[in-house]
Every structure is written in C-alpha cells, then in structure tokens.
Amino acid sequence: MEDNQIELITRMVLNVLQEKQSGKTGFAVPVGVSARHLHLTQDHVEQLFGKGYELTKKKDLMGGQFAANETVTIVGLKLRAIENVRILGPVRKASQVEVSATDAIKLGVKIPIRESGNIKGSAPIAVVGPKGAIYLDEGCIIAKRHIHMSPTDASTAGVKDGDIVSVKVDDERETVFHQVQIRVDSSFTLEMHIDTDEANAAKITCGQIVTIL
C-alpha cells in the first residue's frame, strides 16, 4: 500500500474517533433568527389597544403561534425606547418581552438570559400601545437559544426534551454554539432559534443548516 493511501486511511480513522469522542450526532437543523418580540395577556392587549380588542394575524408560526399585525413600543428604565416591536399570538397567561443583548444596552436595562416562560425575577419593562401603556415589574428576557423538535426528530437525533447540546455552524466563521436547549413537542417543526445578535456574530441567515455535535 502506498504511503499516501496509508496517510489518508489514518486521517479518516482519526476523524471518526474524534467525532465519537465529542458525541457528534451529525443531525442537521435549519436555523430561524428571532427578532425582538413580545407575548401578551388578553388583559394587557385591551389595555394597550382598547377594550374588547383582539390580535389580528399577519403570519402563522409553528406550534399554533402567529405573528400579529400589531406592534408596540417598549421603554426601559432610563426612558430609552424601541419602537415597532411585534406581538406574537395567541394571548398567554403572562406577558413576556424578548429582546437581544444589543437591545438591552439600548434600553439601559440589565436583562437576564432565560428560557422562554421563565420570567420570575426578570427585568422590568414598560410597553406602550395606541390606547394605553402597561408596566411589567418582571417579564423582559433575552431568550436562551434552543432547538424545536418533534418527538420523531428527537428520536432520530438521539436527544430528549430538556437536553443541552452544542451546535456547529460550518461557514467562514466556523462558530460553535454551546448551551443549546432541546425543546420537544408534537406541534413543533424542526428549527434552531437564535436571536439577531447571535446570527450576526456567526454570519447566519434564516434557513441555514447547522449540525448538532
């Protein structure tokens, strides 16, 4: 056997061993980039838009959610504001505002990184609509990056709900995201969700494919 053939085979074997040691699954996932948005209770919708008001649908999203036509302005403690923040429906039991770290700097608010729905002790924020305003003592977070999966996808990838994985972006910036949470539900479509800061840092666009390590 020629020396170059031996070298090639050796390299291939080493690559396989390295992948096994790192626990690489090779499972491919498309990326969705989430811009700042918020979820509201029906009571808060009415305080912002008027009594009896209901959100109107702009675009369907996964899991029965939708992007609403309605937008609001969010205001930090130093009266720094960000306008045209889109509401996602349907209404929830608790209102929640999700922003990026860059948004947090602009708002002048120290905002924790949290899983969606985990708002206890999170940052305060004011929300202003065309008919009124509300003040949330807590509810503003930077959403923890995560992957939505169906049970079938999770089984194929060898992961379960709540698992934490690392994900590699194979582009010119060769980025690896750690601390990516797996979220499994039968209503979910396979997609990794990151915010605009994370997407810009890794030069990722919506629909780009990444790989679970």
UniProtKB/Swiss-Prot annotation:
The places in or outside the cell where this protein is found are: Bacterial microcompartment
Q: Which residues bind phosphate?
A: 92
GO molecular function (one): metal ion binding
Q: Give the EC number(s) listed in the UniProt record.
A: 2.3.1.222
Keyword Nucleotide-binding: yes or no? Answer: no
Say which domain of life the source belongs to. Bacteria
Pathway field of the UniProt record reads:
Polyol metabolism; 1,2-propanediol degradation
Q: Which GO terms describe its cellular component?
A: bacterial microcompartment
Q: Which keywords belong to this entry?
A: Acyltransferase, Bacterial microcompartment, Metal-binding, Transferase, Zinc
Instruction: Spell out the reaction equation it catalyses.
Output: propanoyl-CoA + phosphate = propanoyl phosphate + CoA
Q: Which GO terms describe its biological process?
A: propanediol catabolic process
Residues recorded as binding Zn(2+) 2, renumbered to this chain, are 146, 148, 193
Q: Where does CoA bind?
A: 33-35, 78, 86, 200
Q: How is the cofactor bound?
A: There are 2 Zn(2+) ions per monomer; Zn(2+) and CoA bind inbetween the 2 domains in each monomer.
Positions annotated to bind Zn(2+) 1? 37, 39, 98
Could you tell me what this protein does?
A: Involved in 1,2-propanediol (1,2-PD) utilization within the bacterial microcompartment (BMC) dedicated to 1,2-PD degradation by catalyzing the conversion of propanoyl-CoA to propanoyl-phosphate.
The Swiss-Prot or TrEMBL note on domains reads:
Formed by 2 beta-barrels, each is capped on both ends by short alpha-helices.
Q: Would you identify the family this protein belongs to, as annotated?
A: Belongs to the PduL family.
Name this polypeptide is given: Phosphate propanoyltransferase
Record the organism.
Answer: Lachnoclostridium phytofermentans (strain ATCC 700394 / DSM 18823 / ISDg) (Clostridium phytofermentans)
Report the gene name. Answer: pduL
